[in-house]
Amino acid sequence: MSEKYIVTWDMLQIHARKLASRLMPSEQWKGIIAVSRGGLVPGALLARELGIRHVDTVCISSYDHDNQRELKVLKCAEGDGEGFIVIDDLVDTGGTAVAIREMYPKAHFVTIFAKPAGRPLVDDYVVDIPQDTWIEQPWDMGVVFVPPISGR
């Protein structure tokens, strides 16, 4: 990945609220299935904005910090996804998205961010990201002091 896209907590909340507004009315949904781990925080934000209390997870491992590797399903929610929103932070190459589509063919699959290769696999997303860009999510970063360039 040649570029980095830094996401702040404020940006994430703004994007999640925009996505939530597109998912109204909230009564049409039985619940939310958050893809662990990237979809956990966006899932909580959607649950809050939509007033949804039924939140489950599907646990799929495909990244080891910044290296993509083989998919491994650790836990899945019951059913075919009918009436559920499945949320992840990002659709990248589409590997996880294909697995999600197979597991929950009737779910409404959404992400906050989408790269070109995975975009056709989601029902909705908020932000376009170039394929060669790495996203730094706020839960993966800490706030640190940065000294002035002048050194004074």
From Swiss-Prot:
Binding residue positions for GMP: R69, D92, T93, G94, G95, T96, W134, I135
Keywords: Cell inner membrane, Cell membrane, Glycosyltransferase, Magnesium, Membrane, Metal-binding, Purine salvage, Transferase
Keyword Cell inner membrane: yes
UniProt: Mg(2+) binding residues: D89
GO CC annotations on file: cytosol; plasma membrane
Cofactor: Mg(2+)
Binding positions (guanine): D92, I135
GO BP annotations, alphabetical order: GMP salvage; IMP salvage; purine ribonucleoside salvage; XMP salvage
Binding site for 5-phospho-alpha-D-ribose 1-diphosphate: R37, G38, R69, D88, D89, L90, V91, D92, T93, G94, G95, T96
Domain of life according to the entry: Bacteria
Membrane topology: Peripheral membrane protein
Keyword Metal-binding: yes
Pathway where this protein functions: Purine metabolism; GMP biosynthesis via salvage pathway; GMP from guanine: step 1/1; Purine metabolism; XMP biosynthesis via salvage pathway; XMP from xanthine: step 1/1
Catalysed reaction, written as an equation: GMP + diphosphate = guanine + 5-phospho-alpha-D-ribose 1-diphosphate; XMP + diphosphate = xanthine + 5-phospho-alpha-D-ribose 1-diphosphate; IMP + diphosphate = hypoxanthine + 5-phospho-alpha-D-ribose 1-diphosphate
GO molecular function, one term: hypoxanthine phosphoribosyltransferase activity
InterPro entries for this protein: PRibTrfase_dom, PRTase-like, Xanthine_Guanine_PRibTrfase
Subcellular location, record wording: Cell inner membrane
Annotated binding of xanthine, by residue: D92, I135
PANTHER family (alphabetical): XANTHINE PHOSPHORIBOSYLTRANSFERASE, XANTHINE-GUANINE PHOSPHORIBOSYLTRANSFERASE
Family recorded in the similarity comment: Belongs to the purine/pyrimidine phosphoribosyltransferase family. XGPT subfamily.
Assembly with partners or alone: Homotetramer.
UniProt name for this protein: Xanthine-guanine phosphoribosyltransferase
Lineage: Bacteria, Pseudomonadati, Pseudomonadota, Gammaproteobacteria, Enterobacterales
Gene: gpt
